Amino acid sequence: MKKEKAVVVFSGGQDSTTCLFWAKKHFAEVEAVTFDYNQRHRLEIDVAASIAKELNVSHTVLDMSLLHQLAPNALTRSDIAIEQKEGQLPSTFVDGRNLLFLSFAAVLAKQKGARHLVTGVCETDFSGYPDCRDVFIKSLNVTLNLAMDYQFVIHTPLMWLNKAETWKLADELGALEFVRNKTLTCYNGIIADGCGECPACVLRKRGLDQYMNEKKGANVR
Protein backbone atom coordinates (compact mmCIF):
# COMPACT_ATOMS: atom_id res chain seq x y z
CA MET A 1 0.00 0.00 0.00
CA LYS A 2 2.93 2.30 0.65
CA LYS A 3 3.22 3.28 -3.02
CA GLU A 4 -0.48 3.95 -3.51
CA LYS A 5 -2.89 6.81 -2.93
CA ALA A 6 -5.78 7.04 -0.47
CA VAL A 7 -8.72 9.34 0.19
CA VAL A 8 -9.79 9.76 3.82
CA VAL A 9 -13.37 10.65 4.74
CA PHE A 10 -12.53 13.45 7.15
CA SER A 11 -14.61 15.40 9.66
CA GLY A 12 -11.85 16.83 11.85
CA GLY A 13 -12.95 14.67 14.78
CA GLN A 14 -10.95 12.23 16.90
CA ASP A 15 -11.66 9.15 14.82
CA SER A 16 -11.16 10.57 11.33
CA THR A 17 -8.03 12.47 12.40
CA THR A 18 -6.56 9.27 13.82
CA CYS A 19 -7.41 7.63 10.49
CA LEU A 20 -5.70 10.48 8.63
CA PHE A 21 -2.48 9.86 10.55
CA TRP A 22 -2.89 6.11 9.93
CA ALA A 23 -3.31 6.73 6.20
CA LYS A 24 -0.26 9.00 6.06
CA LYS A 25 1.77 6.15 7.54
CA HIS A 26 0.45 3.51 5.13
CA PHE A 27 0.13 5.33 1.81
CA ALA A 28 2.47 7.34 -0.39
CA GLU A 29 -0.13 10.04 -1.03
CA VAL A 30 -3.18 10.99 1.01
CA GLU A 31 -6.07 13.35 0.35
CA ALA A 32 -8.99 14.22 2.60
CA VAL A 33 -12.63 14.89 1.78
CA THR A 34 -15.07 16.64 4.10
CA PHE A 35 -18.81 16.88 3.58
CA ASP A 36 -20.88 19.99 4.21
CA TYR A 37 -24.32 18.67 5.13
CA ASN A 38 -25.51 21.71 7.09
CA GLN A 39 -24.20 20.15 10.28
CA ARG A 40 -25.17 21.89 13.50
CA HIS A 41 -21.63 23.18 14.01
CA ARG A 42 -20.06 24.63 10.88
CA LEU A 43 -16.84 24.84 12.86
CA GLU A 44 -16.35 21.16 12.00
CA ILE A 45 -15.51 22.09 8.40
CA ASP A 46 -13.07 24.81 9.51
CA VAL A 47 -11.35 22.42 11.92
CA ALA A 48 -11.01 19.79 9.19
CA ALA A 49 -9.53 22.35 6.80
CA SER A 50 -7.09 23.60 9.44
CA ILE A 51 -5.88 20.09 10.32
CA ALA A 52 -5.48 19.13 6.67
CA LYS A 53 -3.45 22.28 6.04
CA GLU A 54 -1.22 21.66 9.06
CA LEU A 55 -0.58 18.08 7.93
CA ASN A 56 0.00 19.17 4.33
CA VAL A 57 -2.90 17.08 3.03
CA SER A 58 -4.91 18.13 -0.01
CA HIS A 59 -8.47 18.81 1.17
CA THR A 60 -11.78 18.85 -0.70
CA VAL A 61 -15.13 20.00 0.73
CA LEU A 62 -18.22 18.64 -1.01
CA ASP A 63 -21.72 20.06 -0.69
CA MET A 64 -24.08 17.45 0.75
CA SER A 65 -26.75 19.83 2.01
CA LEU A 66 -29.45 17.60 0.55
CA LEU A 67 -28.99 15.40 3.64
CA HIS A 68 -30.37 18.25 5.73
CA GLN A 69 -33.45 18.32 3.51
CA LEU A 70 -33.96 14.55 3.41
CA ALA A 71 -33.15 13.46 6.95
CA PRO A 72 -33.73 16.03 9.71
CA ASN A 73 -31.77 15.00 12.80
CA ALA A 74 -29.97 16.34 15.85
CA LEU A 75 -26.71 16.86 13.94
CA THR A 76 -28.32 19.22 11.42
CA ARG A 77 -31.15 20.76 13.44
CA SER A 78 -30.57 22.70 16.67
CA ASP A 79 -34.26 22.29 17.57
CA ILE A 80 -33.91 18.50 17.79
CA ALA A 81 -32.56 17.28 21.14
CA ILE A 82 -29.55 14.96 21.28
CA GLU A 83 -31.02 11.85 22.85
CA GLN A 84 -31.59 8.13 22.47
CA LYS A 85 -34.91 6.60 23.45
CA GLU A 86 -35.04 2.94 24.37
CA GLY A 87 -35.39 0.71 21.32
CA GLN A 88 -34.69 3.55 18.89
CA LEU A 89 -31.67 4.88 17.02
CA PRO A 90 -30.01 7.98 18.55
CA SER A 91 -31.37 11.33 17.33
CA THR A 92 -27.84 11.98 16.01
CA PHE A 93 -28.18 9.20 13.43
CA VAL A 94 -28.36 10.58 9.88
CA ASP A 95 -30.07 8.17 7.48
CA GLY A 96 -27.80 7.34 4.56
CA ARG A 97 -24.88 9.48 5.70
CA ASN A 98 -22.06 6.94 5.47
CA LEU A 99 -23.61 5.38 2.37
CA LEU A 100 -23.59 8.74 0.60
CA PHE A 101 -20.27 9.95 2.01
CA LEU A 102 -18.39 6.83 0.92
CA SER A 103 -20.11 6.79 -2.46
CA PHE A 104 -19.14 10.37 -3.20
CA ALA A 105 -15.66 9.80 -1.75
CA ALA A 106 -15.31 6.89 -4.17
CA VAL A 107 -16.26 9.06 -7.15
CA LEU A 108 -13.70 11.65 -6.05
CA ALA A 109 -11.05 8.99 -5.44
CA LYS A 110 -11.49 7.49 -8.89
CA GLN A 111 -11.15 10.92 -10.49
CA LYS A 112 -7.91 11.40 -8.56
CA GLY A 113 -6.52 7.98 -9.41
CA ALA A 114 -6.90 6.57 -5.91
CA ARG A 115 -8.50 3.23 -5.12
CA HIS A 116 -8.13 3.23 -1.35
CA LEU A 117 -10.80 4.80 0.86
CA VAL A 118 -10.29 5.26 4.59
CA THR A 119 -13.10 5.86 7.07
CA GLY A 120 -13.26 5.98 10.86
CA VAL A 121 -16.44 3.99 11.33
CA CYS A 122 -16.38 1.63 14.29
CA GLU A 123 -18.65 -1.23 15.29
CA THR A 124 -17.33 -1.47 18.84
CA ASP A 125 -18.50 1.99 19.96
CA PHE A 126 -20.95 2.59 17.14
CA SER A 127 -23.85 3.85 19.30
CA GLY A 128 -26.31 1.72 17.36
CA TYR A 129 -25.63 3.29 13.96
CA PRO A 130 -26.35 0.62 11.31
CA ASP A 131 -24.03 2.25 8.76
CA CYS A 132 -21.01 1.80 11.05
CA ARG A 133 -21.20 -1.99 10.91
CA ASP A 134 -18.51 -4.07 9.25
CA VAL A 135 -21.10 -5.97 7.22
CA PHE A 136 -22.34 -2.68 5.72
CA ILE A 137 -18.83 -1.54 4.77
CA LYS A 138 -18.01 -4.88 3.13
CA SER A 139 -21.31 -4.81 1.24
CA LEU A 140 -20.77 -1.23 0.08
CA ASN A 141 -17.22 -2.06 -1.04
CA VAL A 142 -18.58 -4.74 -3.37
CA THR A 143 -21.35 -2.43 -4.58
CA LEU A 144 -18.96 0.43 -5.38
CA ASN A 145 -16.64 -1.90 -7.28
CA LEU A 146 -19.53 -3.21 -9.35
CA ALA A 147 -21.13 0.19 -9.86
CA MET A 148 -17.95 1.90 -11.05
CA ASP A 149 -16.00 -1.08 -12.46
CA TYR A 150 -13.07 -0.12 -10.25
CA GLN A 151 -11.19 -2.00 -7.54
CA PHE A 152 -11.75 0.11 -4.45
CA VAL A 153 -10.57 -1.04 -1.04
CA ILE A 154 -12.34 0.49 1.96
CA HIS A 155 -10.10 0.57 5.04
CA THR A 156 -11.60 0.82 8.54
CA PRO A 157 -8.64 1.00 10.97
CA LEU A 158 -10.94 1.57 13.96
CA MET A 159 -13.63 -1.01 13.18
CA TRP A 160 -12.88 -3.33 16.09
CA LEU A 161 -11.31 -0.83 18.48
CA ASN A 162 -12.98 0.70 21.51
CA LYS A 163 -12.28 4.34 22.37
CA ALA A 164 -9.35 3.49 24.65
CA GLU A 165 -7.77 1.45 21.86
CA THR A 166 -8.36 4.31 19.42
CA TRP A 167 -6.41 6.61 21.73
CA LYS A 168 -3.71 3.96 21.93
CA LEU A 169 -3.49 3.87 18.13
CA ALA A 170 -3.19 7.67 18.02
CA ASP A 171 -0.38 7.44 20.56
CA GLU A 172 1.40 4.74 18.54
CA LEU A 173 1.15 7.03 15.51
CA GLY A 174 2.74 9.85 17.52
CA ALA A 175 -0.46 11.86 17.34
CA LEU A 176 -2.13 11.60 20.74
CA GLU A 177 -1.60 15.22 21.82
CA PHE A 178 -2.46 16.49 18.34
CA VAL A 179 -5.71 14.52 18.31
CA ARG A 180 -6.58 15.53 21.85
CA ASN A 181 -5.98 19.25 21.42
CA LYS A 182 -6.94 20.00 17.81
CA THR A 183 -9.93 17.84 16.94
CA LEU A 184 -13.66 18.51 17.27
CA THR A 185 -15.78 15.61 18.52
CA CYS A 186 -18.20 17.52 20.76
CA TYR A 187 -21.84 17.76 19.64
CA ASN A 188 -21.87 21.23 21.21
CA GLY A 189 -19.04 22.48 19.00
CA ILE A 190 -16.22 22.79 21.55
CA ILE A 191 -12.74 21.83 20.29
CA ALA A 192 -10.37 19.51 22.20
CA ASP A 193 -11.85 18.00 25.38
CA GLY A 194 -15.25 19.48 24.52
CA CYS A 195 -18.21 20.13 26.80
CA GLY A 196 -17.71 16.91 28.73
CA GLU A 197 -21.44 16.25 28.83
CA CYS A 198 -22.72 15.25 25.38
CA PRO A 199 -22.59 11.54 24.39
CA ALA A 200 -19.58 12.08 22.11
CA CYS A 201 -17.58 13.84 24.83
CA VAL A 202 -18.46 11.26 27.47
CA LEU A 203 -17.32 8.43 25.19
CA ARG A 204 -14.15 10.29 24.22
CA LYS A 205 -13.18 11.14 27.83
CA ARG A 206 -13.96 7.65 29.12
CA GLY A 207 -11.72 6.17 26.44
CA LEU A 208 -8.89 8.62 27.10
CA ASP A 209 -9.03 8.07 30.86
CA GLN A 210 -9.02 4.30 30.38
CA TYR A 211 -6.06 4.41 28.00
CA MET A 212 -4.02 6.79 30.17
CA ASN A 213 -4.65 4.62 33.24
CA GLU A 214 -3.63 1.49 31.33
CA LYS A 215 -0.52 3.25 30.01
CA LYS A 216 0.36 4.46 33.49
CA GLY A 217 -0.08 0.95 34.88
CA ALA A 218 2.11 -0.53 32.15
CA ASN A 219 4.86 2.00 32.91
CA VAL A 220 4.76 1.17 36.63
CA ARG A 221 5.36 -2.54 36.06
Swiss-Prot record:
Cross-referenced CDD domains: QueC-like (cd01995)
EC numbers on record: 6.3.4.20
UniProt cofactor(s): Zn(2+)
Top EC class, one word: ligase
GO BP terms: queuosine biosynthetic process
Any one GO MF annotation of this record: ATP binding
Subunit structure comment from the entry: Homodimer.
Classification via PANTHER family: 7-CYANO-7-DEAZAGUANINE SYNTHASE
Name of protein: 7-cyano-7-deazaguanine synthase
